[in-house]
Amino acid sequence: MTMLAEPTPSDAARQVTAAWKQLSRTRRLYSWLGFGLLFLALCGSLWFADDSNAGHFFDRLPHLFDFVSWLIPSDWNDVWRALLDIASPHDNGTEQFNFPLGRVYVWGDFYIPEYVELMIITINVALVSTIIGFCGAMCLCFIAARNMTPFHWLRVIVKRVMEFLRAFPEIVIAGLFAAILSIGPLAAIIAISLHCIGALGKLFYEVIENIDMKPDEGLKAVGANWITRVRFGGLPQVMPNFMSYVLLRLEINVRASTIIGAVGGGGIGQELKLSISRGFGAKTLALVLLLFVTIYAVDQFSAWLRRRLVGEQAFLLQGVGK
């Protein structure tokens, strides 16, 4: 009887190498195919854009950076004068260089620059909206979680409500409420808060559904009610993650409140839109720089605070459980 020779280690290695090379060639082929389809889709979208703009899309491409050249002022010092509401030597009697026009006098000759006040309003809108969104999400998330809900039929309703709240962009909701409540920060607060409840609620209940259920089972065994089980069995495990998500949402809401200001939500976004529409280059650049510095500072601070919260998770769990 003829015995079949068993494959040697070198034969097995060659087979693995050949299979790996074949897989690499297949992946490379799929990658090039994907890039080709993406390139065709890009060309098709450019053709559609040119056709939709009556053939002027490609004609206007050389003027793509005209806005940047308009934004750069002839005198760079006017940017700082506009930011601090200091008189400009180029003042010609119009609002373009009349920077002290927006001063907000607090006491005597002490004033807050107009754009700084508007930036504070924008941050306050984001902060208040985040707090309202956090409170609303906290009220709904444990009901929406599969492992903690007291009534499963109520869980379905709550999840649908949160899906509805986050289905519409903040700017759409803000435009609706601005038409109802008039222009101002109130419309922005309502719009961002509603969207924040839906977004944070989804993140929160997904965290809750992955907690360790042993503490909850122990509390249930001694006859604890649902609120007590949530307080001592659920919250200690999820609060660090909740705080991390809230701080991340605060970063998003600062940017959202700026954008919403352009549709009547007040704050610095509304002033930025007016400066661009009126052709005030120095004021526009001052607002852009202030926005960049502020959003960068908020992002860095919230990222640092998130790292501290997640790093001290054991300490927070111990403090909440007491």
Please give the residue ranges for each predicted region.
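A structural signal for multi-pass alpha-helical bundles of membrane permease subunits
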Residues: 44-51, 174-181, 296
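C-terminal transmembrane helix and the adjacent membrane-cytosol boundary/short C-terminal tail
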Residues: 285-322
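Short amphipathic alpha-helical coupling elements at transmembrane boundaries
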Residues: 66-73, 117, 121, 156-166, ...
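Membrane-cytosol interface at the C-terminal ends of specific transmembrane alpha-helices
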Residues: 159, 184-234, 240-249, 300-303
